[in-house]
Amino acid sequence: MKRMNKTKFAKAASAAFTGHRFYNFSQKELIKERLTKAILEAYKHGISNFISGFAIGIDLMAAQIVQSLKSSCPGRTLTAAIPFRGQADRFSANDKMVYENLIASADEVLILSERYYTRCFLDRDEFMVENASLLIAFYDGREKGGTYYTFKKANYLGIPVVNVY
């Protein structure tokens, strides 16, 4: 993977998101409330750029929240860290529409690879953690999958984690 070292944002002012693709739909409003609170708290403490991997589930939800706070959080930006071109090709019609609207309104879109490869999601997660000073997570404690990997990587690098699970 070709690493992108030059970005428009500063690591010290950036937070990344990680979370499960699937969650209990009956808890959607509670999850949104917790994510919103974590985003506002981060913003209050100097985080102005939010990096999302734009996967189905928590990533898209968090990106939507960041965009909804545009008027109440001056200077906040949304960065899309896309693991490979065509990420949304297999999304449902609704998720694809949400994805495309968010991509169109994102402040920066980084396509990390032109095509899918086995580690592309993990490499995207590493990119986000390595370019953030805070990780906002929706992590249930299971020791498998991309959310676990990202959570573990942030801890290894000494990056603070706010888990809204």
Where are the regions that the model predicts?
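Acidic/glycine-enriched connector segments
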Residues: 2-165
